[in-house]
C-alpha cells in the first residue's frame, strides 16, 4: 500500500502445477491489472483469468480458436471487453507458407471469451520492414540474452528459421508488441511495437499515425509518421 506494507500475496501454487509442458499452468502470469470493479485480470499461455482479491477465480477462459501464445499485455475496454496480445496458429502467408505468427495479433474478446474483433498486424503493417530490427542490441533485448553479443546488431535474414527470433516476415518476431492502449475518443488502439515503433490504428484497421524513425516506411505509411515540432510549431531536425 502507500505505506509500503504488504496487504496481499498470491501464492504461486494457485496458478502453477510445476509441469512446464503445460503452458496454461507454468505460472507465467503476465499483465496483472486491477480493473474498475477491483478484481484482477491476467493471462498465461492459452488462457486468461479474472480473480478477486480473496483468490476467487471468476473467469478462466481459453483464447478463441486459432489464437496462441498470449503474453505481455491485456487491457479492459470501457465496454468491459478485453484487448489481448496474441499470435495466430496456422496462418497462411501470401506466398502460401503456413506458420504460427509471433506477437503480431491483437484481439478483442467479450465477457464470454468470444472473439469480437481482430487487428491482424501482418496485413495492417509491413512485416518486411527491418530498420529497427537491424538496430537491436542482441546482448540486451533478444530472447536468449547473451552478454557476449552486447553491441552486436541483429541480422534480420530472410532465410532465418521460422521461429521466435527477431527477423522479417510473418513467422518470425518482426513486430513484438509490448503494450496496448485504447483511445475511446476515436475507438482506436495504440501499440508499442518494439521492432516497428509506436503506432495508432483505428477500428477500420487503418494506421492513424506512427511515432518513430521515418526510415524504411513504404509510400503507404510515409505521411503517417509524426514530425517533431517545437512549442511554436517549427520543425525540429
Give residue ranges: language-model regions.
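Histidine-/acidic-rich catalytic cores in large beta-rich domains
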Residues: 1-237
Amino acid at each position: 500500500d502507500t505505506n509500503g506494507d504488504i496487504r496481499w500475496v498470491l501464492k504461486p501454487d494457485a496458478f502453477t502445477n510445476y509441469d512446464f509442458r503445460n503452458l496454461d499452468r507454468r505460472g507465467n502470469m503476465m499483465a496483472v491489472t486491477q480493473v474498475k470493479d477491483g478484481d484482477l485480470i491476467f493471462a498465461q499461455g492459452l488462457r486468461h483469468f479474472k480473480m478477486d482479491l480473496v483468490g476467487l477465480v471468476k473467469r478462466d477462459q481459453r483464447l478463441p480458436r486459432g489464437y496462441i501464445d498470449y503474453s505481455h499485455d491485456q487491457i479492459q475496454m470501457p465496454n468491459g471487453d478485453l484487448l489481448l496480445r496474441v499470435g495466430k496458429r496456422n496462418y497462411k502467408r501470401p506466398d502460401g507458407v503456413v506458420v504460427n505468427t509471433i506477437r503480431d495479433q491483437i484481439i478483442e474478446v467479450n465477457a464470454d471469451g468470444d472473439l469480437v474483433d481482430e487487428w491482424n498486424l501482418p496485413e495492417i503493417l509491413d512485416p518486411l520492414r527491418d530498420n529497427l530490427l537491424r538496430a537491436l542490441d542482441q546482448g540486451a533485448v533478444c530472447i536468449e540474452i547473451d552478454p557476449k553479443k552486447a553491441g552486436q546488431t541483429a541480422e534480420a535474414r530472410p532465410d532465418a528459421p521460422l521461429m521466435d527470433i527477431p527477423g522479417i516476415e510473418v513467422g518470425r518476431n518482426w513486430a513484438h508488441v509490448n503494450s496496448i492502449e485504447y483511445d475511446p475518443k476515436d475507438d482506436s488502439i495504440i501499440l508499442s511495437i518494439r521492432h516497428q515503433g509506436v503506432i495508432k490504428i483505428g477500428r477500420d484497421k487503418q494506421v492513424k499515425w506512427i511515432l518513430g524513425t521515418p526510415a524504411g516506411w513504404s509510400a503507404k505509411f510515409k505521411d503517417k509518421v509524426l514530425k517533431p515540432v517545437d512549442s511554436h510549431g517549427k520543425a525540429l531536425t
